[in-house]
């Protein structure tokens, strides 16, 4: 331990309330401010460069992420050149009753988590979706023909690692050519 201030929390009746502040290693400059309500992240988290300029903004509601993310270069310019989701499908329905969805990114060296499922009330809930990664860079959904009717679409979310270490969320609804796949 260096003896320098690292993080501050405000507590009310034993639970985190208000804004938690994390500092750079010098103990003076603010790295991140995270709002809390009843011990849970709630509101816009703001990250800062050592210069004091805003580095990133992410929003939470009751501990869950909203898709909102803004990141900025050290000169204040918005970052916009993120990797994005690429969807490839393979239709073998007539041959063996399968339909495969492969997820990857347009930038092959960027890591991501891929999930089957969508947002709940506009929020990303990792417990309500199924991780489908087959590597750090791709995910696969193998659907099979069933005797029962099923949804004619699949929802997916890519949780993309940004150059600043945050997670960009990208949602996609993929229409299926058949309504009996599970």
Please describe what each predicted stretch is.
Residues 1-182:
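Glycine/tyrosine- and acidic-biased, solvent-exposed loop/turn segments at the edges of beta-strands
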């Amino acid at each position: 331990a260096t003896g320098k201030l690292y993080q501050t929390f405000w507590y009310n009746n034993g639970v985190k309330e208000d804004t938690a502040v994390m500092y750079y290693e010098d103990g003076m400059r603010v790295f991140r401010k995270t709002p809390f309500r009843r011990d849970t992240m709630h509101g816009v988290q703001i990250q800062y460069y050592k210069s004091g300029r805003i580095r990133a903004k992410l929003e939470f509601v009751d501990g869950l992420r909203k898709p909102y993310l803004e990141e900025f270069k050290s000169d204040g310019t918005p970052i916009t050149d993120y990797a994005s989701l690429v969807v490839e499908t393979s239709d073998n329905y007539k041959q063996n009753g399968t339909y495969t969805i492969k997820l990857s990114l347009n930038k092959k060296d960027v890591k991501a988590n891929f999930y089957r499922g969508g947002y709940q009330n506009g929020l990303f809930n990792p417990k309500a979706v199924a991780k489908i990664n087959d590597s750090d860079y791709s995910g696969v959904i193998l659907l099979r023909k069933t005797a029962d009717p099923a949804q004619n679409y699949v929802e997916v979310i890519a949780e993309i690692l940004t150059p600043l270490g945050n997670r960009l969320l990208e949602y996609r609804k993929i229409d299926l050519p058949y309504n009996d796949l599970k």
